[in-house]
Structures are given as structure tokens and as C-alpha cells.
């Protein structure tokens, strides 16, 4: 009888990959076959997941076995009574969760769930994974564990990959895997950087390095002229380190390097990404970022020469590293100072070269240095970003002795990320609780992270308690509500949604500081402590400009913060402080978007039915969230929508986000380097902080996979 049933199942159920592929084929009426993808989910669960899952007679037996066999971390479970743990697992399994798309289910079972050590059988379903994440992050707090479970199962909150993947496992990686480190202009710092690249890449980390402080090619060493090799050999060493330490062969290490636009090596730096670059200088796997101050744009407008300053001389004359000097502010005096060597380059030629390289490779990322620092409420200077260009935090230099031991441990940066699904968050029965739970969950990631192999990362995290609460599914939500991406209603909603998120996130951080009697280091020197930060919200009219958006917030039962609420929050923050130095950052969200059935981040879809290359599996198809055959007109893709509307949307969010947002620009295949330059200038004028990749329509044919940091993009 069992054989007959199996035969019937095979006959009735098409191969789940074939069913999923039918998303890419219209039916006889010319309609997209959304039902085939739902059938693919059912077939995948029935014919692959269930037959390959280990079953237990009870949850108690399951937990005992997983602990005894070394799968679950017993210390996580021991913070609670076993009765509570079993009750929470039972609660999770009665939530009614089901995957909305085949790609979501496929991603979860191939990349996230706990498997037997031979990799052949599944030990968790989605509810199990969520429960273990909640138990880990709540650290013994039963109320928080229940709230985290509900927020994740409802699809409102989704921790980033390293957290969601590793929580509760006995054999696990770090809960965070995105790092930013400075390199100073000495061999000890360079040596430490290569070691840090190895250590962090071994742990699956994506690491960005600041190169701006390194002396240029031809600079003196010990006063002997023309001795320095510049930044390119350091880039080569870092690239080799990432290639070597590739997480047990599972994934190539991921690295990025940032260089200031006024560094003398800037053109050589950019040329490393040319398709026809000499192999001696070509950089194949490192991501590149350029830090551009306001003065560069002003010089380009005037068609003037831009000076490139020797970091060696600037540090010698100013007594501080090049990256810590505000170039726009000191530009004229740097030009006039004869003690500082300089080269000259036409500013428009620089932007032309920048666009040419982006046209060829999609790189470099851009950080608008002065925009970032004007918006920064924390004392100190921001001089770099990360592998996905959304982390923007202050850092400080470390010093080493000749043994590479620290004589002064500076502060480097790690990113503790997770995202809210905008559509489900707007549907939340308690918007305030959703945001508070997410902030508390991410704060737990910071509190639990100890990267001892790189002491400056450990010190920076301990001092800042920084987190990055992100957002996803903006396009999906707007389309569900009948709003076109980039329309006046869409911009109005984006502004007010992030406005509301900001108030609730800050309030939660204030509550954490009050509960713990502790703020982030440097709070007293911040614009939060002085109350200055809140001025923007105590002025102006922060209410809906369109009737449609007013209706959305009313229907969701969300009270937009009033001036009185902001004034009270300001007073509370000035009295108690805030616990987290940084609260928001919007990453690109790759795999977690698919699991959550969300559009990525806050940018538009790249296709109505996205085609993903999934390793040996080949092509997998993903339909945009909330899309039906009746509302297709609301699902213009990013190439059709164009750069300006994307920039306008990000500008509305940027005014509220204390860190950055991963902003990819999409261009049709008819675009020129002039179009790219115009978009860069428009983004600068609109107050955008960073630009991520440049994508041209023909590049999408190669596949839509994101090469970047697993913490952010996947």
C-alpha cells in the first residue's frame, strides 16, 4: 500500500523545480501561473523535506537528543525552565506559518535549517529555527522570547543571516559577520590588517578596510624619496588573504577597500577594476569604494583642477591621519601649504574615469563624505563604509608595537543587522511592540558578540552597542496598497514610515539605557545628549501630505509621533541617555527577503519574476510579493523606474536613518557614462549618503546573484 501511495504522489505531483519554472511561462490566457509556485512549495515539502526530516516522538525527546548529540547549545536552553521551552516550541508550531514561495522554502532548507552532521537530513523546520533564535536572543527573558517568536513567525522581523543561521547551535559561527577596520600608515597596522582579514574571513565575515591613510606610491620612507609602493600591493595582499581563508572552502572570503578621492593613488586604485587591466594590478574579488567630499563636486562644477594630497605629509603636518581630516573644510589651506606634496587632476576627468569603471564593473561604491558627517550625531569622524555601503560609524586608530601587540586599542566596527518587513509591520497589531522587540533582539546580538581575534572590533562593539535595524518589502507593500513606486504617495509614506520607526527605535534605546544604567561610550559628547538632534523633529510639519498615506496609518492604528512626544523623548534621552550608539541601517537583504517573501530592501524589484542562479540547482524563479495578474502595472522594475525616483525614495528615508542605506542604481542598456555622472550628482544634491552598485540592464542577463557580504546581502 505504501508503494502505491508513493506512486500516486509521484504521478500527481510534478517535480517541484518544474512547477517553479512554470512561473516563467504564461498560461493559455497569457497570465502568470502563480498557482504553480504554490504547488511547487507543497511538492517540495511533501516529496523532499518530510521524507528527509528526522522525526521524534515528543518535543522533550527531540531536545534531549539534539543536546546530547551536540547539535543544540544546552546553555541556551538552560536559561529557561524546560516546560517554558516546550511550550514555546508548541506555540511556534501552531502559528500556521507556511512558505509563500518555492524560493523561500528552498533557501531556508538549503541554507539555514539545522541538518545532521552528514548534511543529509533535516533537524528543524522554520518554527523550530525561529524558536531557537528567540530563546538565544532573549537570554532567559521569557516575555522577550515569546515576543521575538511572534515577530519572526509573523514575518514582521527577520534577523540577518549570521544571526538566524547560528543562534542556538552548538557548532556555530559568529552571530555577526560584517566588519570595518582602519589601516594606519605603518607596517605594523598593515600586518595586523592582513591577519584580521584571515581571522574574520575564516569565520565567514565580510570585511571592509580603510586605505586612505596609507602613503601614496613614490612617497618617502624614512625620508628617502620614491620608496613607497602605495595602496595597490596592500590591496593584493588583502585579496590573497580573503581568497585563502574561505570558510572551509564553502564560500570565498568577501572584502572591500575604501580610498579617499583626494588620495594620489586614486586613479591607479580605480584602474584595478578595468577589464583590460594588467594582471599585476588587477583586483578581481575585492570590492572598491571611493570617499568623495563636497569640494570634489564643487571643483567639477567649475571645471577646475582637484588637488591630491600626500597622506604622509598631511599626517606629518597636521598630526593626525589623512582620513580624519575634513578635506572640504581644509582644502584651500592644504593647497596653499608648501609642506604638503600634491598632484593635480581635472575634477571632471576624475568623475568621467569613475563612471567608466562603474560602467565596466559596477564598482566603486561611493560614500558622500560631508553629507555623512553632517548627519552624524556622534562625536568623531566617519571615513569609510562596509561591504554593502550601509554601515556608517565613527572609528579610531589603534597603535602597535614591533611584535604587533596593541599599545593602544582603537575602535573598529561590527554590524549587528536585522530587518523589518514593512508590509507585515504596517499590519502589526502593535507597531510599537514590533519595533521595540526588534531593537531589543538586535541589541542582544551586540551584547553577545565577542570577536576576540580582533581586539579593536571587540572594543568598538563593547563601547558602541551599535545595531542596524533595516527595512525590506517597500515596493511590495506600496503595490499591495495600489501605490506606484516613486509617486508622491510613495515618497510621503516612506518619509513618515521611517519617521515613526525612528521615534520608536530611539525610545527603546532610551528604555534600555534607563533599565541598565548604561549608555554607549561617548553619549555625553553626542547631539543626543545636548538635545540638538531632536530639533529637526520639533520643527516643521511631520504629518501626511496625501490623503492616501493618512488612511494607511489610520487603518494600521499607528499614531505618528507628535511634537509633544518628541519633546518628551528628548527630555528622557537627555536624562537617561540611549544604549545604542547607532540604531538604523538599511542593508540590501538578499536571502532573508526571499524567506520573508519580501522585495529587497527599499529599492524596486529587478523583475516581475526574478531569476536566481542557485549553484548546482540552476535557475529558480521568484514572483514579486503581492503581485497578481490584475496589478502588474504597479510592478515596474528598477530599470523602468529609473535612477531619479529611486534616489528620491532613498532621500526620504535617509533623513531619518542615522547610518546609511544600500542604494543600487539601475540603468537601461542605452545609458552612457554621462547618465551615471548625472545620477551621482543628483544623489549628492538630494542628500544621499552612499551609493552601492551600478547595474546596467545587460548585466542582469548574467544572473541576479549578489556578490557581497553574507551578513547584509544574504
Curated annotation (Swiss-Prot):
UniProt key word Glycoprotein: no
Main enzyme class: oxidoreductase
Sites marked Important for hydrogen atom transfer: 178, 415
Catalyzed reaction equations: a 2'-deoxyribonucleoside 5'-diphosphate + [thioredoxin]-disulfide + H2O = a ribonucleoside 5'-diphosphate + [thioredoxin]-dithiol
Domain of life: Bacteria
SUPFAM superfamilies in alphabetical order: PFL-like glycyl radical enzymes, R1 subunit of ribonucleotide reductase, N-terminal domain
Site (Interacts with thioredoxin/glutaredoxin): residue numbering on this chain: 709, 712
Site note Important for electron transfer, residues: 692-693
Any single Pfam family the record assigns to this protein: Ribonuc_red_lgN
Residues bound to substrate: 161, 177-178, 206, 386-390, 588-592
Activity regulation, free text: Under complex allosteric control mediated by deoxynucleoside triphosphates and ATP binding. The type of nucleotide bound at the specificity site determines substrate preference. It seems probable that ATP makes the enzyme reduce CDP and UDP, dGTP favors ADP reduction and dTTP favors GDP reduction.
One Gene Ontology molecular-function label: ATP binding
Biological process according to GO: 2'-deoxyribonucleotide biosynthetic process; deoxyribonucleotide biosynthetic process; nucleobase-containing small molecule interconversion; ribonucleoside diphosphate metabolic process
Residues of the active site: 386, 388, 390
Record-annotated disulphide pairs: 178-415
Regulation: induction: Induced 2-fold by hydroxyurea.
Matches recorded under InterPro entries: NrdE_NrdA_C, RNR_1b_NrdE, RNR_lg_C, RNR_lsu_N, RNR_N, RNR_R1-su_N, Rrm1
GO terms for cellular component: ribonucleoside-diphosphate reductase complex
Subunit annotation: Tetramer of two alpha and two beta subunits.
UniProt function note: Provides the precursors necessary for DNA synthesis. Catalyzes the biosynthesis of deoxyribonucleotides from the corresponding ribonucleotides. R1E contains the binding sites for both substrates and allosteric effectors and carries out the actual reduction of the ribonucleotide.
NCBIfam families with a match to the protein in the record: NrdE_NrdA, RNR_1b_NrdE
Protein name: Ribonucleoside-diphosphate reductase 2 subunit alpha
Gene: nrdE
Amino acid at each position: 500500500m505504501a508503494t502505491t501511495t508513493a506512486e500516486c504522489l509521484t504521478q500527481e505531483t510534478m517535480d517541484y523545480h518544474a512547477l517553479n519554472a512554470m512561473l516563467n511561462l504564461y498560461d493559455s490566457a497569457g497570465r502568470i501561473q502563480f498557482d504553480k509556485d504554490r504547488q511547487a512549495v507543497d511538492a517540495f515539502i511533501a516529496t523532499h523535506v518530510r521524507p528527509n526530516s528526522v522525526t521524534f516522538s515528543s518535543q522533550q525527546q527531540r531536545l534531549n537528543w539534539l543536546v546530547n548529540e551536540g547539535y543544540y547549545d544546552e546553555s541556551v536552553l538552560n536559561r529557561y525552565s524546560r516546560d517554558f521551552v516546550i511550550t514555546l516550541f508548541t506555540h511556534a508550531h501552531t502559528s500556521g506559518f507556511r512558505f509563500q514561495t518555492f524560493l523561500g522554502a528552498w533557501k531556508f532548507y538549503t541554507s539555514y535549517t539545522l541538518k545532521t552532521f552528514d548534511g543529509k537530513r533535516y533537524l528543524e523546520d522554520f518554527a523550530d529555527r525561529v524558536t531557537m533564535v528567540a530563546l538565544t536572543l532573549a537570554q532567559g527573558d521569557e516575555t522577550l522570547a515569546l515576543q521575538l517568536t511572534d515577530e519572526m513567525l509573523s514575518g514582521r522581523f527577520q534577523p540577518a543571516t549570521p544571526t538566524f543561521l547560528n543562534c542556538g547551535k552548538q557548532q556555530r559561527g559568529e552571530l555577526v559577520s560584517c566588519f570595518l577596520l582602519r589601516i594606519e600608515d605603518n607596517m605594523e597596522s598593515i600586518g595586523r590588517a592582513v591577519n584580521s582579514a584571515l581571522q574574520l574571513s575564516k569565520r565567514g565575515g565580510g570585511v571592509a578596510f580603510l586605505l586612505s591613510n596609507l602613503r601614496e606610491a613614490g612617497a618617502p620612507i624614512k625620508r628617502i624619496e620614491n620608496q613607497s609602493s602605495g595602496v595597490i600591493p596592500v590591496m593584493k595582499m588583502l585579496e590573497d588573504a580573503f581568497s585563502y581563508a574561505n570558510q572551509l572552502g564553502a564560500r570565498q572570503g568577501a572584502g572591500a577597500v575604501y580610498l579617499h578621492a583626494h588620495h594620489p593613488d586614486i586613479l591607479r586604485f580605480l584602474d584595478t577594476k578595468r577589464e583590460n587591466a594588467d594582471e599585476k594590478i588587477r583586483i578581481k574579488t575585492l570590492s572598491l569604494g571611493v570617499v568623495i567630499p563636497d569640494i570634489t563636486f564643487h571643483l567639477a562644477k567649475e571645471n577646475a583642477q582637484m588637488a591630491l594630497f600626500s597622506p604622509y605629509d598631511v599626517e606629518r603636518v597636521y598630526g593626525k591621519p589623512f582620513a580624519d581630516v575634513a578635506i572640504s573644510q581644509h582644502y584651500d589651506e592644504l593647497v596653499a601649504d608648501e609642506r604638503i606634496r600634491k598632484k593635480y587632476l581635472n575634477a571632471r576627468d576624475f568623475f568621467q574615469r569613475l563612471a567608466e569603471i562603474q560602467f565596466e564593473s559596477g564598482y566603486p561604491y561611493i560614500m558622500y563624505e560631508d553629507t555623512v558627517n553632517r548627519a552624524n550625531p556622534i562625536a568623531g569622524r566617519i571615513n569609510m563604509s562596509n561591504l554593502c555601503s550601509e554601515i556608517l560609524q565613527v572609528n579610531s586608530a589603534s597603535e602597535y608595537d614591533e611584535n604587533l601587540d596593541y599599545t593602544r586599542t582603537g575602535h573598529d566596527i561590527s554590524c549587528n543587522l536585522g530587518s523589518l518587513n514593512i508590509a507585515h509591520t504596517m499590519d502589526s497589531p502593535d507597531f510599537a511592540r514590533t519595533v521595540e522587540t526588534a531593537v531589543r533582539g538586535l541589541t542582544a546580538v551586540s551584547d553577545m558578540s565577542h570577536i576576540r581575534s580582533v581586539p579593536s572590533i571587540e572594543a568598538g562593539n563593547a563601547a558602541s552597542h551599535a545595531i542596524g535595524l533595516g527595512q525590506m518589502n517597500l515596493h511590495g507593500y506600496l503595490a499591495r496598497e495600489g501605490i506606484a513606486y516613486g509617486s508622491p504617495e510613495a515618497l510621503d509614506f516612506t518619509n513618515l514610515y521611517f519617521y515613526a520607526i525612528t521615534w520608536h527605535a530611539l525610545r527603546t534605546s532610551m528604555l534600555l539605557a534607563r533599565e541598565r544604567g548604561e549608555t554607549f561610550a561617548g553619549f555625553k559628547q553626542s547631539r543626543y545628549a545636548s538635545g540638538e538632534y531632536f530639533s529637526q523633529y520639533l520643527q516643521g510639519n511631520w504629518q501626511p501630505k496625501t490623503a492616501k498615506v493618512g488612511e494607511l496609518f489610520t487603518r494600521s492604528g499607528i499614531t505618528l509621533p507628535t511634537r509633544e512626544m518628541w519633546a518628551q523623548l528628548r527630555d528622557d534621552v537627555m536624562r537617561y541617555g540611549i544604549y545604542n550608539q547607532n540604531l538604523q541601517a538599511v542593508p540590501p537583504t538578499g536571502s532573508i527577503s526571499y524567506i520573508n517573501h519580501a522585495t529587497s530592501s527599499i529599492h524596486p524589484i529587478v523583475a516581475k519574476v526574478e531569476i536566481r542562479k542557485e549553484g548546482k540547482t540552476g535557475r529558480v524563479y521568484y514572483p514579486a510579493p503581492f503581485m497578481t495578474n490584475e496589478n502588474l502595472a504597479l510592478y515596474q522594475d528598477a530599470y523602468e523606474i529609473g535612477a531619479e525616483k529611486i534616489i528620491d525614495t532613498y532621500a526620504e528615508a535617509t533623513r531619518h536613518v542615522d547610518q546609511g542605506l544600500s542604494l543600487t542604481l539601475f540603468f537601461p542598456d542605452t545609458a552612457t557614462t554621462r547618465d551615471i555622472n548625472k545620477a551621482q550628482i543628483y544623489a549628492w544634491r538630494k542628500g544621499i549618503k552612499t551609493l552601492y552598485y551600478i547595474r546596467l540592464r545587460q548585466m542582469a542577463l548574467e544572473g541576479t546573484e549578489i556578490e557581497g557580504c553574507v551578513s547584509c546581502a544574504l
